[in-house]
Amino acid sequence: MNEQQRKQQSQIRTEQANVDRIKNTSSEDMIAKYFQQEYEPQSPDIKQARKRKREDVQFHYDFSIPEDMEKIGHGKKFLIRTYGCQMNEHDTEVMAGILSEMGYESTTVTEEADIILLNTCAIRENAENKVFGEIGHLKPLKLENPDLIIGVCGCMSQEESVVDRILQKHQHIDLIFGTHNIHRLPHLVKEALFGKEMIVEVWSKEGDIIENLPKARKGKIKAWVNIMYGCDKFCTYCIVPMTRGKERSRRPKDIIQEVRHLVAQGYQEVTLLGQNVNAYGKDFEDIEYGLGDLMNDIHKIDIPRVRFTTSHPRDFDDRLIEVLAQGGNLLDHIHLPVQSGSSEILKKMNRKYTREEYLELVRKIRIAMPNATLTTDIIVGFPNETEEQFEETMTLVEEVGFEAAYTFIYSPREGTPAARKKDDVPEEVKKQRLYRLNELVNKQSAASMKDYAGKKVKVLVEGESKKDPEVLAGYTEKNKLVNFKGPKSSIGKIVEVEITETKTWSLNGVMVENTVEVN
């Protein structure tokens, strides 16, 4: 028997021991053992979540890697696979920063990794299926290398049913943690390295705000800046309030300091992040300060581009519109999820606005910023959506003139009110509606792109095109993808490009000589 076979047999014996242990332990006992005391062993409960109290959020500025963990990753590598939204991408940057400070190096090669983390998304069933598929694919790698640490984190980890499934069926997973305790990663890795059982630490109570977490950002061109956490809107289809917790805002001074630091490092663009970004500041009790005020302060900082996402129409107030209308580094590309064009469906979704109120908000934005680009999110096939209600969505898309949209078939999420609704819309009808909606969105996108033919646009160059390394790619102020040929030295800079060809979702052009705007 060679060394590899011995390792595999040892791993199999360990897994069998875990299986036997789990068989002799009830799911409730397992969950009670691994989850914090605040966690009640049950599926996400929106009624209980609504009753949560607004406790004082503590701010911490003293994060550091424990001395005994500072070099534990020396000579080892990590890989983080990220699923879902920009918030998850930002969380991945934080985890990568922590692991880097522990001595680990990043890799994109699965077989090279000593730690693999799956940063998961729970917003749709399809995203969860991808994660469980990946968990299965990693099992042979774990058998081959028993010292490999495999962890599952992110929003799926906040679901009791997901953790229970992993405990029962995927004993090759070493580590599970949630969205509220990322700062405890060094301690969790240590436990996984030296412990003999699967390490599970999921907090149901929202975490405090940890301000000085390290971040390993990709490049020095664009940066995510998280300004708040959580969501209190409780849309009936959405699990985010359960997986991300109540709304908690960072202090303005900490955000502004982070943006200034990014400017000093040479970043050209920041995107302010939040599950419901324009609810920023509503939880402050000592100051009256919202997203409009924050944007106004960042407007004064010498950074070329500032964006924000994702906003909720209900919180998009006149102050924010007034500030955005100043222009300058505040870009007039606004992502404003509508979800449906039917007031009846919007009410069932608990969006707290009507079709007419949404259109009035769009009118206000257009008056203040006539050239603003609007994009959106839309769900089709919400339980019992009629053909007439779907047509209302189609006419709203045309009336607003969205230049892009993220479109989805409704995906029921366990524990949400909408998931309990009886649905009489056939799956084939939902697919047809999605197809028709996408056809309309594609048509409107193509029409908006044609307006750029022959014009010159400012492009923040992000790197080589994914399709051709001889071509550079970047984005305009209105978030349009532009491909063009130019010197590699222009990467990370804002250049002027003349558009020579328009496509449905991208533009081609030629770089105008001597137009580098930012060094």
Curated annotation (Swiss-Prot):
Region described as Disordered: spans on this chain: 1-23
Catalysed reaction, written as an equation: N(6)-dimethylallyladenosine(37) in tRNA + (sulfur carrier)-SH + AH2 + 2 S-adenosyl-L-methionine = 2-methylsulfanyl-N(6)-dimethylallyladenosine(37) in tRNA + (sulfur carrier)-H + 5'-deoxyadenosine + L-methionine + A + S-adenosyl-L-homocysteine + 2 H(+)
Primary enzyme class: transferase
Boundaries of every Radical SAM core domain copy: 217-450
Binding site for [4Fe-4S] cluster 2: C231, C235, C238
Cofactor: [4Fe-4S] cluster
EC number(s) on file: 2.8.4.3
Cross-referenced Pfam families: Radical_SAM (PF04055), TRAM (PF01938), UPF0004 (PF00919)
Domain (TRAM) ranges: 450-513
Keyword tags: 4Fe-4S, Cytoplasm, Iron, Iron-sulfur, Metal-binding, S-adenosyl-L-methionine, Transferase, tRNA processing
Gene3D superfamilies named in the record: Methylthiotransferase, N-terminal domain, tm_1862 like domain
Gene Ontology CC terms: cytosol
GO MF term set: 4 iron, 4 sulfur cluster binding; metal ion binding; N6-isopentenyladenosine methylthiotransferase activity
PROSITE patterns hit by this protein: MTTASE_N, MTTASE_RADICAL, RADICAL_SAM, TRAM
Cofactor: how bound: Binds 2 [4Fe-4S] clusters. One cluster is coordinated with 3 cysteines and an exchangeable S-adenosyl-L-methionine.
Ranges of biased composition (kind: Polar residues): 7-17
Self-association and partners: Monomer.
Protein role: Catalyzes the methylthiolation of N6-(dimethylallyl)adenosine (i(6)A), leading to the formation of 2-methylthio-N6-(dimethylallyl)adenosine (ms(2)i(6)A) at position 37 in tRNAs that read codons beginning with uridine.
Protein known as: tRNA-2-methylthio-N(6)-dimethylallyladenosine synthase
Gene: miaB
